[in-house]
Amino acid sequence: MVKWKYILGEEALPHAADSADPHAPRIELRTEWLKTPGRNGRFSIVPIFLTFCGQGRGMSGADHTFPLYKEVIHMSTVFITGGSRGIGAAIARTFAFKGWNIAFSYLHSEEAAHALQNELSARGISVLAVRADAADPAQAAAFIERAVQELGAPDALVCSAGVALPQDVLTHVSDEDWRRVFSVNVDGLFYTVRAALPYFIRRRKGAIVTMSSMWGQIGGSCEVAYSASKGAVIAFTKALAKEVGPSNIRVNCVAPGVIDTDMNAHLSAEDMQALAEETPLGRIGTPYEVARCVRYLCSDGAEFITGQVIAPNGGIC
């Protein structure tokens, strides 16, 4: 299955005078179209040229044709775990804005997942939403296999599925709660990357982004389970980057500070205000500020960056 996207041409359009000017050019648009392969064998029709014709100041009356798209390249595809809400949904939207095809998994938020799928599909990209528990090795692998079948091999993988516990002292953390945090935040990362890695290695390229937290870097009081699991994510990232670097695969980690998402819903308004005041930039971060870091690490601009932890945290650590 072949997918294509187009790069906007750099040629400048002729300057158009103020529309109130009686001598302003009268412009007629003529569009030529190109038929391109689309999802499941269907074709998309996209413009490749605009022709301006008209008379007035700055225009000779002759036709002016400008290419909208200069080259055709393979459309990029990203797989995202935990993509239906919060930071995961912001990541999906950020990639969609850049024209990437997207497969994302979700667990409980079925309504939000389908709403996001419809929203992103309206941009003309291919979007797949799959219900899968990252903590289940069979479901994690099934998500990757389904995504490959529908969209082809991934160019990037973003592991953003994660859970946290309400703040409490370690002696009040149950065995089940401890195991659940690690099963999603650490085991789920392992299961997902293990399933996807052969597709990256086979093509000898790709980017993997994991999701830690500032608590994984500095630790958080009454957040021992979460902090420990996110510290493990950082170690996983650094080790894997060394392992797959010779295959031209980059692995990096994003470790956000306090971000305005549902995961922090257990914090009181006073707690959030206190955290904002402790942040040098004086505010809480947004999911899209994290998402832009993730997308950058998957872009060509980061092609010599691997094994690193990027911390969008407002300077808090």
Give the positions of each predicted feature:
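C-terminal helical subdomain
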Residues: 253, 275-305, 312-314
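Conserved glycine-rich cofactor-binding loop
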Residues: 84-85
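Substrate-binding pocket helix/loop in short-chain dehydrogenase/reductase
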Residues: 168-170, 174-182, 271, 275
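Active-site helix of classical SDR
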Residues: 193, 229, 237
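Conserved glycine-rich Rossmann-like NAD(P)H-binding loop of the short-chain dehydrogenase/reductase
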Residues: 98-115
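Alpha-helical segment proximal to the catalytic Tyr-Lys
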Residues: 198, 242-246, 303
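Residue(s) in the substrate-gating loop at a strand-loop-helix junction
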Residues: 213
